[in-house]
């Protein structure tokens, strides 16, 4: 018979061996129960799902439909109901994203030459460019030029004065005076800055007369259409009219471009130039020019 101490050691060894067996069996059972939950669809399963989505128009299947589809697809591989549900959800999201991407590409406007020309024409104004191609600055407020200012404004088909050897001559016996580049309403700013002009007309049907013109130069911007209208002489009596308005009655201006005569034509250095108009049937419109 063994002593009690030896019995206690045997019992302790049996307990340790039992614990080791239980741990091994437990660990082995855990590894056997651990399975992969990721679904790997087969080709037949994907084909059937796409037929249901596109041909049968099934976008969000119900619970009964999911069970039936799962039972049908299980014949071709391992699958669960949640795999069917998530496949429809993901496929529907991809379709929405694809439509959105295609829609943004289709709605993007293409920059065609016609649209570019139309955009350029919207910002182009003929009064802001002179014939040398140098752009002029647009005024702060758009100026609406009224061309129908009674009968005093000239039509574009009438002859305009031209410079020949320093003299300003009229092509015909009209009464236009000092209208330079009137087709666009503005004088080009590249010729000695801004210039202003005025003219005096002396209508003589009987004898000669003197026309006085004082020279005053200004550097303010000038628009020919802002000036007052010239008046025409009537009934054969002598009248002295000017192209300026009431504000220019005392100060009449001419173009400060080129000198026409020597110093002997200047009366006393006062800036006034006198010219004798011969007695003719047509009116005498004289316009003298000086450098600034």
Swiss-Prot record:
Keyword RNA-binding belongs to the record: no
Domain of life of the organism encoding this protein: Eukaryota
Listed GO MF terms: DNA-binding transcription factor activity; transcription cis-regulatory region binding
Ranges of Basic residues composition bias in the record: 1-11
Major localisation: nucleus
InterPro entries tied to this protein: HD, Homeodomain-like_sf, WUSCHEL-like
UniProtKB keywords: Activator, Developmental protein, Differentiation, DNA-binding, Flowering, Homeobox, Nucleus, Oogenesis, Transcription, Transcription regulation
DNA-binding region: 34-99
Tissue: In the active shoot meristem, it is specifically expressed in a small cell group underneath the presume position of stem cells. Also expressed in the floral meristem. Expressed in the nucellus of ovule primordia.
Cited function: Transcription factor that plays a central role during early embryogenesis, oogenesis and flowering, probably by regulating expression of specific genes. Required to specify stem cell identity in meristems, such as shoot apical meristem (SAM). May induce shoot stem cells activity in order to maintain the stem cell identity. Involved in the developmental root meristem. In shoot apices, it is sufficient to induce the expression of CLV3, a putative ligand of the CLV signaling pathway.
Family: Belongs to the WUS homeobox family.
Self-association state and partner proteins as the record states: Interacts with TPL and TPR4. Interacts with BZIP30.
Protein name: Protein WUSCHEL
Native species: Arabidopsis thaliana (Mouse-ear cress)
